[in-house]
Amino acid sequence: MERPSIAVLLEAAELQRKKAEDYNNKASRVKQADYYPRGVMSILDIINAKVLRIYSVLEAMENGAKPNFESVEDSGLDLINYASFLVTYMRFELEGQDLNRDIFNRGCDREDK
């Protein structure tokens, strides 16, 4: 029997695949790395915004409100995926990432190209 946490990771991976069809469709010139102009710092900004949203929703739920659109669970799945983008960026493997730039998207001479 598969561990529930592994099932969540697989669900997040499937969500990432489906969202990629919209965010990175083949007819577009926009590459995944274009969403992160400051490299890992941009990804961390998005992760921080997701965490703040979770706090906001949970605080509202404590007072009886329900989320209008994205649930805490949805945000959790997004966090898993943004964490995977962070690691992929750190490994210089993100689609459209310029290998002549560092993890902060600054120009550099990388020795490990």
Task: Please state what every model-predicted region is.
Residues M1-K113:
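Intrinsically disordered, low-complexity regulatory regions
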